[in-house]
């Protein structure tokens, strides 16, 4: 599928957001290519409930990139990534990061494979699988999950993927007091960091969790 042209205002919103977050303006062109592809495919395959490109910039791209300063080079598994969020924006922004995009939905996996191909992302691959069925135990330095389950639920289905000393980076809305209290034995919260996302009024927190 060819790219779908986006209004100039969408590019301006993204560029302003990147600037306010202190991120490189050179990230804008590949991010816009990804967004254009997502917008086009979404019309047919219903990959995300958000359909307005302006809203996609804020709630998908900038929200995903808010965690970028806390992501280290190495390997990262993005669990239940949907159409590639936050994994594809992170792969674009972090060339030293090897991202595995874990998603069991076939339509979303096909979209991501096409996006990875069109963007030439040599540091991203798609694993069409449920997280709990992925046979890659202890392989990842970092796990992330932006819209998947509670902290305990993420650990239950994906904790086996994390190497000793690795970290789970979980995107949450309001401070997740109850979820933290329900973490399994041996899993500890290292830090809860408030995040600021340009154009997003709601609370966002990044919860950093270490394994046993």
From Swiss-Prot:
It comes from the Bacteria. S-adenosyl-L-methionine binds at residues 80, 85, 131-132, 146. It catalyses: guanosine(527) in 16S rRNA + S-adenosyl-L-methionine = N(7)-methylguanosine(527) in 16S rRNA + S-adenosyl-L-homocysteine. SUPFAM superfamilies: S-adenosyl-L-methionine-dependent methyltransferases. One of its GO terms (molecular function) is rRNA (guanine-N7-)-methyltransferase activity. Disulfide bonds: none annotated. Keywords: Cytoplasm, Methyltransferase, rRNA processing, S-adenosyl-L-methionine, Transferase. It is an enzyme of class 2 (transferase). GO terms for cellular component: cytosol. It holds the Pfam family GidB. Its EC number is 2.1.1.170. It is found in: Cytoplasm. Coiled coil: none annotated. The keyword Membrane does not apply. NCBIfam families: rsmG_gidB (TIGR00138). Belongs to the methyltransferase superfamily. RNA methyltransferase RsmG family. Specifically methylates the N7 position of guanine in position 527 of 16S rRNA. This is Ribosomal RNA small subunit methyltransferase G. It comes from Stenotrophomonas maltophilia (strain K279a). The lineage of its organism: Bacteria, Pseudomonadati, Pseudomonadota, Gammaproteobacteria, Lysobacterales.
């Amino acid at each position: 599928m060819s790219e779908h042209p986006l209004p100039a205002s969408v590019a301006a919103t993204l560029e302003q957001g990147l600037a306010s977050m202190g991120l490189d303006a050179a990230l804008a062109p590949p991010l816009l290519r990804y967004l254009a592809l997502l917008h086009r495919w979404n019309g047919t395959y219903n990959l995300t409930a958000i359909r307005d490109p302006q809203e996609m910039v804020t709630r998908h791209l900038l929200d995903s990139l808010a965690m970028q300063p806390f992501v280290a080079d190495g390997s990262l598994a993005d669990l239940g990534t949907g159409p590639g969020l936050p994994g594809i924006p992170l792969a674009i922004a972090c060339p030293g990061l090897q991202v595995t995009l874990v998603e069991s939905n076939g339509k979303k996996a096909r979209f991501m494979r096409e996006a990875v191909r069109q963007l030439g992302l040599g540091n991203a691959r798609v694993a069409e699988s449920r997280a709990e069925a992925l046979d890659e135990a202890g392989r990842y330095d970092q796990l992330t999950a932006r819209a998947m389950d509670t902290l305990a639920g993420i650990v239950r289905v994906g904790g086996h993927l994390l190497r000793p000393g690795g970290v789970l980076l979980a995107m949450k809305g309001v401070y997740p007091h109850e979820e933290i209290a329900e973490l399994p034995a041996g899993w500890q919260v290292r830090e809860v960091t408030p995040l600021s996302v340009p154009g997003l009024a709601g609370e966002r927190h990044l919860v950093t969790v270490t394994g046993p």
